[in-house]
Amino acid sequence: MINIRKTHPLMKIINNAFIDLPAPSNISSWWNFGSLLGICLILQILTGLFLAMHYTSDTMTAFSSVTHICRDVNYGWIIRYMHANGASMFFICLFLHVGRGLYYGSYTFLETWNIGVILLFATMATAFMGYVLPWGQMSFWGATVITNLLSAIPYIGTNLVEWIWGGFSVDKATLTRFFAFHFILPFIITALAMVHLLFLHETGSNNPTGISSDADKIPFHPYYTIKDILGALLLILALMLLVLFAPDLLGDPDNYTPANPLNTPPHIKPEWYFLFAYAILRSIPNKLGGVLALVLSILILVLMPLLHTSKQRSMMFRPISQCMFWVLVADLLTLTWIGGQPVEHPYIIIGQLASIMYFLLILVLMPMASTIENNLLKW
């Protein structure tokens, strides 16, 4: 009798995606982050579901409901901190996953890459709205500052902001709708992730060399299932170390103060994973210009296939491009640091230089490096 996993309509899909899938024999640990992102997403949905059972999305009770979860609900504290720090792990995996895609030229799978960019935007939107829910000082002022950026849009800006707010300021209506969106978006992300995977399996995985691996494929199970389990264990270990030993390490102390519209915190800043984009936003003195730079800093990923001038797909055998890539990584780390600093000298000029460098590297220097390498190889 033929195995049920190959005949059953539902099992067949799972089999072709996770068991009998032909995978390149040489994919490194950088290919683990896709499965880790899936684990993060499941973990966030589960912890979020249990948090939603006790949370109230009302300005009068939101802050105290989070306190109630931590103090009175059985294991509420661990669920809350797993959710908050799970978001950080999610973004660490996301950035490494995107970085892998840039380094090894995975962006040449156009559909997979573009859905990935949409996934990145959706995840950022979800995380932003989730940060507003505890209704602390940084929640309130973060929501006010970021939603206010939309007022820079000509003609419709002010109306758009008031429409999103559901009033003339960030208030009860805003909190309620943010909770509704924060709840629904992860399920949309799950659907998009399935489409992401569907398009990936149309072409098959890339590999570190960037060369076709059709001649040398191995089954996904057991080789990559065991490898993914190791990655998952390390991810959970890192998350639990963070949750149990330093749960507030990546948070802002200001968020332990209930939201007060009459008192502005000295330094308004988002969570660490948005700081690079926040630094780019702040480095431009013009409001609309800043907003455009902020959006373009992520949207520029869509242009990567067009900016690929090399005759080789991967950076594995391209030392000049490798150098440029790591300068870009260093630049992003610099921007992340600057985003968390106050707006004063010398941080302003460092932020402006790092922002210019970011766009210069992606739009000019990296394509130039690829062209130089082509010429050196007489291609």
UniProtKB/Swiss-Prot annotation:
Bilayer-crossing regions: 33-53, 77-98, 113-133, 178-198, 226-246, 288-308, 320-340, 347-367
Keywords: Electron transport, Heme, Iron, Membrane, Metal-binding, Mitochondrion, Mitochondrion inner membrane, Respiratory chain, Transmembrane, Transmembrane helix, Transport, Ubiquinone
Lineage, uppermost ranks: Eukaryota, Metazoa, Chordata, Craniata, Vertebrata
Membrane topology qualifier: Multi-pass membrane protein
Protein name: Cytochrome b
Cofactor: heme b
GO biological process: mitochondrial electron transport, ubiquinol to cytochrome c
Compartmental location: Mitochondrion inner membrane
